[in-house]
Amino acid sequence: MELLAPNLRVVFCGINPGLSSAHQGYPFANGSNRFWKVVHQAGFTDTQLAPEQWQQLQDTGCGITALVARPTVAASEVTRDELLSGGEALKEKILRYQPRALAILGKQAFSSAFGVKNAAWGRQEMTIGKTEVWVLPNPSGLNRATLEQLTESYRELFLALK
C-alpha cells in the first residue's frame, strides 16, 4: 500500500498499516481514521476520496507510504528498532523520488525513526535531499486531536506548498 512517484508535492507517511487496512488492501481504511476527510478539508483533494480510491491521490500530486510495513492493531505495537530501520528505508525512498515535502504522521514516530528529540509540529529544520520534512498529527481515531485541529495542521502544509 505505497504510492510513490517522482516529483510529487507531498508524500504522507503513516506509522504502519492497521489491521483494517491490511485486510482491505487500502491505506487509512479504518472507519475511525480521519485521513481522507482531513486531506480533503485541508485542500489536497477536490473531493473526499474513499480508501478504495487511494491510488487517485497521486493525481493530486500526493503519495503515501509508511515507516513500517507490518500491520498491527495499534501503532504502539511497533518497536523502536522497526521505526529506526523504517526511517532509514524512508530516507532512501525520499532521496529516490524527491517529493517537495515529506509529512510524517506522528511526532513520536518521527522522533524514534530519525533520532530527533523534542520535535515540534510542522516544518522541521532537517531535509532529505531537497525534500522538506514536516511532522503532522496522526489522523487515527485514537488521536485526541479534533478534526478541526488536524485540518488546520494539514492546511498549513498545503498552503506552504502552493
Swiss-Prot record:
Ordered alphabetically, the record's keywords are:
Cytoplasm, DNA damage, DNA excision, DNA repair, DNA-binding, Hydrolase
Q: Name one GO molecular function term.
A: pyrimidine-specific mismatch base pair DNA N-glycosylase activity
Recorded GO cellular component terms are:
cytoplasm
Q: Give GO BP annotations, semicolon-separated.
A: base-excision repair, AP site formation
> Which catalytic reaction applies to this protein?
Specifically hydrolyzes mismatched double-stranded DNA and polynucleotides, releasing free uracil
CDD domains, alphabetized: UDG-F2_TDG_MUG (cd10028)
- Which domain of life, per UniProt? Bacteria
One Pfam family from the record: UDG
Give the EC number(s) under which this enzyme is classified: 3.2.2.28
The similarity comment for this entry is: Belongs to the uracil-DNA glycosylase (UDG) superfamily. TDG/mug family.
Protein's job:
Excises ethenocytosine and uracil, which can arise by alkylation or deamination of cytosine, respectively, from the corresponding mispairs with guanine in ds-DNA. It is capable of hydrolyzing the carbon-nitrogen bond between the sugar-phosphate backbone of the DNA and the mispaired base. The complementary strand guanine functions in substrate recognition. Required for DNA damage lesion repair in stationary-phase cells.
PANTHER family in the record, alphabetically?
Answer: G/T AND G/U MISMATCH-SPECIFIC DNA GLYCOSYLASE (PTHR12159), G_T MISMATCH-SPECIFIC THYMINE DNA GLYCOSYLASE (PTHR12159:SF9)
- Its protein name is G/U mismatch-specific DNA glycosylase
Q: What organism does the UniProt record list as the source? A: Serratia proteamaculans (strain 568)
